[in-house]
């Protein structure tokens, strides 16, 4: 479990409910899958540094933009509730902010799953100085 936490921290840096995002990815994709994204491309990990290198990197870019749009919420600290129903992630709770944070994490998790075939090992630990200016959110 400690490894999962470290991987989650690498995945989104200081953004979001790291434990929950890491758990969500782990549950959706299996053991060890989350660590593939810790330093991937220009947008996975801490900061948003450039144009996405591929569809997998775009998942991280879209996730960070999703957080950025949550102006009345604090995705860095807001914890949320979610469950699995018939293989689908279901965001719960009555608080609109935490539900929106959950929806951002859910979208990222599904994006990673749906783009597994675009994952390219050459971007696994990508030098950030090669990243070009990021696209606007």
From Swiss-Prot:
Membrane-spanning parts: none
Localization of this protein: Secreted
Any single GO CC term annotated in Swiss-Prot or TrEMBL for this entry: extracellular region
Classification via SUPFAM superfamilies: Phospholipase A2, PLA2
InterPro entries referenced in this protein's UniProt entry, alphabetically: PLipase_A2, PLipase_A2_Asp_AS, PLipase_A2_dom, PLipase_A2_dom_sf, PLipase_A2_His_AS
Annotated disulfide bonds: 42-131, 44-60, 59-111, 65-137, 66-104, 73-97, 91-102
Entry keywords, A to Z: Disulfide bond, Myotoxin, Secreted, Signal, Toxin
Site (Important residue of the cationic membrane-docking site (MDoS)): 121, 124
Protein purpose: Snake venom phospholipase A2 homolog that lacks enzymatic activity. Is myotoxic and displays edema-inducing activities in mouse paw. A model of myotoxic mechanism has been proposed: an apo Lys49-PLA2 is activated by the entrance of a hydrophobic molecule (e.g. fatty acid) at the hydrophobic channel of the protein leading to a reorientation of a monomer.
Name of the protein in question: Phospholipase A2 homolog PLA2-03
High-level lineage: Eukaryota, Metazoa, Chordata, Craniata, Vertebrata
């Amino acid at each position: 479990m400690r490894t999962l936490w470290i991987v989650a921290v690498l995945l989104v840096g200081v953004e979001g409910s790291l434990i929950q995002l890491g758990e969500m990815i782990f549950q959706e994709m299996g053991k060890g899958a989350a660590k593939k994204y810790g330093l991937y491309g220009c947008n996975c990990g801490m900061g948003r540094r450039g144009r996405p290198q591929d569809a997998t990197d775009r998942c991280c870019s879209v996730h960070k933009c999703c957080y950025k749009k949550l102006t009345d919420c604090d995705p860095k600290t807001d914890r949320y509730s979610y469950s699995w129903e018939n293989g689908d992630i279901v965001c719960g709770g009555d608080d609109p902010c935490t539900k929106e944070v959950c929806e951002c994490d859910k979208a990222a998790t599904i994006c990673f799953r749906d783009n597994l075939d675009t994952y390219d090992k050459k971007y696994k630990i990508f030098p950030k100085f090669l990243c070009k200016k990021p696209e606007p959110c």
